[in-house]
Amino acid sequence: LKYYYDNTWKPQYDRWLNLLAGWTLHKDYPIIAWNAALTTDMIFTQPVVYEFGNIKCPTLLIIGTRDRTAIGRERASKDIQLKMGLYNELGKKTQKAIPNSTLVELDNIGHLPHIESFDRFIKPLIEFIQK
């Protein structure tokens, strides 16, 4: 909640929660769960940062500058934890690593800018797609 919604849940977020929870009721839930497990495994065991330079298509990166999400943070030492999830730095590094990429930083937005501030998210997305 801290990095996703600025520690404040709003009723307009309910539909996104219901969407995610609804997958568990679908007949294809085992497939969805398996894909989620594979994605989680990739995040933990196969860093893709080294492959960013291989991306050939124009790429838009939209980040919230308040985001400090860091998977595995609780397993790291305190000094390493302080260096994790610094998206205001990671966004710039990622943009430099991906050829033909554009970075949009949304101030005071957390991990889910498309939910937390849809209007600020959708404008640069549409502009990018229309190029």
Protein language model annotation of sequence segments:
Residues 88-131:
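Catalytic active-site module of serine/aspartate enzymes centered on a nucleophile-bearing elbow/loop
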Residues 7-14, 131:
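Surface-exposed helix-capping loop/turn segments at secondary-structure junctions
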